[in-house]
């Protein structure tokens, strides 16, 4: 029987161990998509308790606490940090097979030096150790980033954001990790939302463009894209129900926008037409500017209306949506390809059943750059051992796994960089298994290039950041 999470955790063969320890283990981290707060990086926040780090905004953990029958006051309510931590610790032993069990222990080992198991009985010991360590200067936000080997971070930012914290970080020569904005214009696209008109007023104000029709909206967006570019941005991200394609005449789009500006209801057909026009416009702009387009789709959000009214969005009440017409995604990309206007694109579906359809669609539009159109890493409800293995296996079956740009945290926590270790161990186990099974030669030079590429180097080349590859 193997020891729990020893140095060869998840490494099932001798080749897997060699690939991980020789090539993957010490590679830097390029975190090209996350939700951490740049203000906390600039201010070099020091957390008071492990609860603030772990449970302050982690809806992954909140879902499992609720699944374990924990009262909401210990999840998002007004109970003390110590009480919330106890509730989480008592939930942990039930999470056999869940990545949260692995991630939590990886974090305890890497950042706090704790080698035991977290449960209700050890909660006091772990609480005291973690809180003591968090007071050390080595445990500030910036030091956590540095000791994790991170070279660059892309946050997630709205077009109306001032990006003041990114500017301050860039001007601070005491911190050499690049922290760049990423453009997330969902609020400018969601014409069906009752908040759309108020958001358009905000966008008009910050852009200096009075938005009255689609042409002026495009002008306002271009104004803000130019500002984001001046701040180092070259990455966008979109959250879509699915990648739709419902083309419409400019006059139709103007009429739909006019309804949204006045707060009038728009039909589902009108919503899809407006969003199609919006996505085609921004995609063409991304291509012209050399930006990368990320699209996350396949999520049905805010399913528990009662809890949404109490807590708002992103609190643990989202699920996988099984409706994603692949034909429309292909038509969307085809519309861009007509005039060679497809930007580098990364497609993430929350539904693992979409792996093969993504794999076949991206193969229809590859050109010019290795892996120009990417299937994104297993995301959210899929970033566990099974999900990561299935995503990479599908990509290998249908495309060039060696060009894959690998893992991202997609997290709000400064301790989540262990997810890269988790991913790299799974990658090396998968590739090592193929080699040991005679499905790929034991060509260590080729394997080194593949593993280092997927862990880091491919993303350096793909995004074009001012970073050096690791040879």
Give the positions of each predicted feature:
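Divalent-cation-assisted or electrostatically stabilized phosphate/pyrophosphate-binding catalytic cores
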Residues: 323-329
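Short glycine/proline- and charge-enriched loop/turn segments
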Residues: 308-316
